[in-house]
């Protein structure tokens, strides 16, 4: 996969871009929000300010999120749904309040369409093991794309081994965006699901969900969206998208790790069997058999990640207060800025890595090329200057410099 050897520069998300110390940045949202993030206040590498550009992997957390989690641990820590005492009631209210916030954030029709999971990976596995086992037979088809994260490939490969389903992969077009015509050509009467990234974590392209959904509906297929790179960066409306399933991870939304969510249309969730067994997902338990709770409880077996869910709710509050339209606009400016401005330090790092001596003097080239003009640099995904929708992230390789070497140089370069 391309992502294994790429260096990623992410000028992405209001919860991260405030770490970008660019003296002529397009607007000041980043600088105004930087103080909200305790981790960005530290000094590193000879007393230089921390500049964090790895949000596509995990985002940093604002004080509001950290404080909400600490407050719960210090004041309200108790199990949810299982006690009548004050702490349990308060903990349950906060936990379910986070579900309400997520439902509003993605415009779900009902709070019951939001299932808490450990993250997007678990959410996709839940769909594969519950919906997939109930609806996919030998010879049925799942259409994916070659740009998918491993989390949206491996669960379907496991089901392929178990059930004999067929996996098909849509290719990219000349701009390294989804080739919708090729995707359509893969769809047949046996196609039951199309599972695609809303935004590619490596290519940055924003996939045309409406075209994918239209093609799926014509074949009677369901649609799953991996929205890890879209939910924190742009307005996402599941009703407008008309997807059947959508997954995202809290740690990419300014929230904690260990929590995420699955959105599913209620008419599908109601028909899906439990994936895991345990407390809370049952209605009645007898020695001979058990009956199961309705969604979302049916899919939340055992004690959930309560504090993490509350932290995710606080992250949603934080993003909502900024406004997702404002976040999207700012990130578009940052992405264009990243591609169009001169990149002398990156060029210097490339030259230093490529030089047998790696001398310090090689870090200050006379030329000031733009990112796309650095010799030997291979950029992935569409160029935002071409007017093609894409996220504010950049992945690249160099033809002679190993990604690990270049990443090490970039990690220590002056901000």
Question: Which residues fall in each region the model found?
Answer:
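Sec-dependent signal peptide recognition
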Residues: 3-12
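Intrinsic-disorder-associated interaction segments
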Residues: 2-3, 26
């Amino acid at each position: 996969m391309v992502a294994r050897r790429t260096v990623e520069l992410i000028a992405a998300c209001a919860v991260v871009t405030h770490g970008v110390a660019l003296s002529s940045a397009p607007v000041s949202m980043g600088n105004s929000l930087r103080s909200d993030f305790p981790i960005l206040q530290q000094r590193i590498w000879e007393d230089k300010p921390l500049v964090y550009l790895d949000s596509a992997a995990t985002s940093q957390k604002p004080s509001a999120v950290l404080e909400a989690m600490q407050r719960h641990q210090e004041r309200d820590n108790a199990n949810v749904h299982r006690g009548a005492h004050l702490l349990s009631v308060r903990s349950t209210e906060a936990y379910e309040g986070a579900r309400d916030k997520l439902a509003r954030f993605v415009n779900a029709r009902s709070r019951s369409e939001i299932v808490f999971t450990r993250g997007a990976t678990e959410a996709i596995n839940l769909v594969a093991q519950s919906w997939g086992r109930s609806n996919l037979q030998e010879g049925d088809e799942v259409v994916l794309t070659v740009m998918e994260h491993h989390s949206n490939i491996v669960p379907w490969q496991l089901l392929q081994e178990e059930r004999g389903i067929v996996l098909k992969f849509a290719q990219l077009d000349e701009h390294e965006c989804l080739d919708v015509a090729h995707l359509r050509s893969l769809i047949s009467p046996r196609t039951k699901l199309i599972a695609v990234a809303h935004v590619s974590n490596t290519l940055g392209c924003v996939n045309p969900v409406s075209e994918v959904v239209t093609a799926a509906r014509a074949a009677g297929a369901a649609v799953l969206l991996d929205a890890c790179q879209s939910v924190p960066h742009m307005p996402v409306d599941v009703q407008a998208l008309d997807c059947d399933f959508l997954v995202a991870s809290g740690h990419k939304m300014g929230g904690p790790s260990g929590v995420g969510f699955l959105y599913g249309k209620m008419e599908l969730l109601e028909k899906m069997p439990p994936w895991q067994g345990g407390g809370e997902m049952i209605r009645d338990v007898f020695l001979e058999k058990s009956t199961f709770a309705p969604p979302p409880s049916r899919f939340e077996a055992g004690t959930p990640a309560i504090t993490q869910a509350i932290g995710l709710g606080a992250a949603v509050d934080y993003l909502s207060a900024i406004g997702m339209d404002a976040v999207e606009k700012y990130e578009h400016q940052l992405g264009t800025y990243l591609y169009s401005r001169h990149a002398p330090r990156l060029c210097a790092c490339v030259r230093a890595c490529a030089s047998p001596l790696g001398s310090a003097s090689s870090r200050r080239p006379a030329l000031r090329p733009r990112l796309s003009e650095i010799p030997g640099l291979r950029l992935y995904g569409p160029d935002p200057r071409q007017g093609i929708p894409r996220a504010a992230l950049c992945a690249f390789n160099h033809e002679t410099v190993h990604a690990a070497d270049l990443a090490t140089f970039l990690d220590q370069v002056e901000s």
